[in-house]
């Protein structure tokens, strides 16, 4: 297997790794129930109904 001809500098190594960092998912607090939810997504409440933007969009099955 070939080896590098020149040593990679700290700057080049760190610039390459600059995109490797992980970001935590965004979390919002539901206004009515106070539970933690992902924003811009529908979620199932404790009663089994679907909620979006604080409004019930589907009844429990």
UniProtKB/Swiss-Prot annotation:
Keywords: Ribonucleoprotein, Ribosomal protein. Residues 1-16 have a biased composition (Basic residues). It comes from the Bacteria. GO terms for biological process: translation. GO terms for cellular component: large ribosomal subunit. Residues 1-47 are annotated as: Disordered. One of its GO terms (molecular function) is structural constituent of ribosome. InterPro entries: Ribosomal_bL32 (IPR002677), Ribosomal_bL32_bact (IPR044957), Ribosomal_zn-bd (IPR011332). Residues 29-38 have a biased composition (Basic and acidic residues). Pfam families: Ribosomal_L32p. PANTHER family: 50S RIBOSOMAL PROTEIN L32, LARGE RIBOSOMAL SUBUNIT PROTEIN BL32. Belongs to the bacterial ribosomal protein bL32 family. This is Large ribosomal subunit protein bL32. It comes from Bdellovibrio bacteriovorus (strain ATCC 15356 / DSM 50701 / NCIMB 9529 / HD100). The gene is rpmF.
């Amino acid at each position: 297997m070939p080896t590098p001809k020149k040593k990679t500098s700290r700057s080049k190594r760190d610039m390459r790794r600059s995109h490797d960092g992980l970001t935590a998912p965004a979390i919002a607090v539901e206004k009515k129930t106070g539970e933690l939810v992902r924003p811009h997504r529908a979620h199932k409440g404790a009663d089994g109904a679907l909620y979006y933007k604080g409004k019930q969009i589907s009844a429990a099955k």
